[in-house]
A protein has these predicted regions:
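Inward-facing hydrophobic residues that define packing positions of alpha-helical scaffold repeats
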Residues: 61, 73-74, 89-92, 105-112, ...
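TPR-repeat structural position
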Residues: 66-67, 101-102, 139, 174
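Short extracytoplasmic
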Residues: 56-87
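TPR/TPR-like alpha-solenoid signature
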Residues: 47, 51-55, 90, 127, ...
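Transmembrane signal-anchor/signal-peptide helices with a preference for the extracytoplasmic
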Residues: 32-52
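Soluble extracytoplasmic domains of inner/organellar membrane proteins
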Residues: 83, 96, 110-207
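N-terminal positive-inside, membrane-proximal cytosolic segments immediately preceding the first
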Residues: 1-31
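Amphipathic alpha-helical repeat scaffolds
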Residues: 51-54, 58, 74, 90, ...
Length: 207
């Protein structure tokens, strides 16, 4: 019993000596937990607001209020939301709501800087950027963008190869086009129109 009392006294003395530390640690843990809950709640509120703004922008497009919808979509892009920022960029491009190519490229860079993007979503955005800048004929930049995709097992690998083949085919650089078309034919993907590839390969062969 005396030994038990002695141990209890030692514990109480240790607690008293480090009382401030234990209290500070407890307060710190509570603060961290509270901040976590607040950030989680704030993030959900922000995502809801972005979602509502995205829907509003689409409604405005249907009502032909293009300037207002463009402003909303560009604002969503700057929010760097992993879902709605890329979708907003795609709408800007598909609907031709922004004519300044430099701005579009800047928007691409903003979206590509989003940290929590899914890998395949990131690859799709890279492919779309390559397609966009191909209109200005920046060959080296296109290759730089797409090389990591075509040298991977990405679901966008075949689409990237086809785009590069079509890109060079359109400029009558048939040897380069053949290089990419040949890879596609060797892998026999289901999501690519192989008849079109074979037709172009025949044109290259007979050209």
């Amino acid at each position: 019993m005396n030994e038990y009392n002695s141990n209890s006294m030692q514990f109480l003395n240790i607690f008293k000596n480090y009382k401030k530390i234990w209290i500070s640690l407890g307060i710190f843990i509570i603060l961290v937990f509270t901040l976590f809950l607040w950030f989680d709640y704030s993030d959900k509120i922000n995502k809801k607001k972005i979602s509502e703004d995205f829907i509003k922008a689409k409604v405005l497009i249907s009502e032909k209020q293009l300037e207002n919808s463009t402003q909303i979509l560009t604002k969503i892009i700057t929010k760097k939301d992993n879902i709605y920022s890329p979708l907003s960029l795609f709408i800007l491009i598909d609907r031709k709501l922004e004519n300044d190519e430099n701005k579009i490229i800047d928007y691409f860079n903003v979206v590509l800087s989003i940290k929590n993007l899914n890998k395949e979503d990131l690859n799709l955005i890279i492919l779309k950027k390559a397609i966009f800048i191909s209109e200005t004929g920046e060959e080296q930049e296109i290759i730089k963008l797409l090389n990591p995709i075509i040298n991977s097992d990405s679901v966008w690998k075949m689409e990237s190869l086809k785009f590069l083949g079509d890109y060079y085919f359109s400029y009558k650089q048939f040897n380069k086009a053949k290089q990419y078309y040949s890879v596609i034919l060797s892998e026999n993907p289901e999501n690519i129109d192989l008849n079109e590839i074979k037709r172009k390969m025949n044109i290259i062969k007979n050209g």
